[in-house]
Amino acid sequence: MGKIALQLKATLENVTNLRPVGEDFRWYLKMKCGNCGEISEKWQYIRLMDSVALKGGRGSASMVQKCKLCARENSIDILSSTIKAYNAEDNEKFKTIVEFECRGLEPVDFQPQAGFAADGVESGTVFSDINLQEKDWTDYDEKAQESVGIFEVTHQFVKC
């Protein structure tokens, strides 16, 4: 199946460097089995800190699971070197923020939640634990004395 990139698009107001924080950041995804096409009903998360051994000593992945329909063992791995921030200059454009190595599992939907951080453009103030589940976030930058926000968060998956 190969590599699949998650691209984010958002409107940033007075913030930049929107990024996932830490190896325990949870990427909430819905997955499709590459063998039978079954799509998971529930959101599943994968984290950089999780590593599961593949059968037959073929390395490891962030998630290994057996398809409920066809019983095939599939895996997906977060490629840590591909994690990128979404910056002010990326405003309202799709930008790859992470890539996944997919072996039988294909991400088909993404739900941003808590664990993001961003910096004030003028002040450098760090806004931590940003939750994007509602696709919008607002706050106030005391140092710069201006409102800050992230709006209209959307995503797409593209094959690399």
UniProtKB/Swiss-Prot annotation:
Domain comment, as recorded: The N-terminal and the C-terminal half of the protein have a very similar 3D-structure, suggesting they arose from duplication. Requires a bound zinc ion for normal folding and solubility.
Keywords, in A-Z order: Metal-binding, Phosphoprotein, Zinc
InterPro entries cross-referenced by the UniProt entry: CXXC_Zn-binding_euk
UniProt keyword Metal-binding present: yes
Gene name per UniProt: Czib
Protein family per UniProt: Belongs to the UPF0587 family.
Protein name, entry field: CXXC motif containing zinc binding protein
Organism per entry: Mus musculus
Stored PANTHER family: CXXC MOTIF CONTAINING ZINC BINDING PROTEIN
Positions of modified residues (Phosphoserine): 75
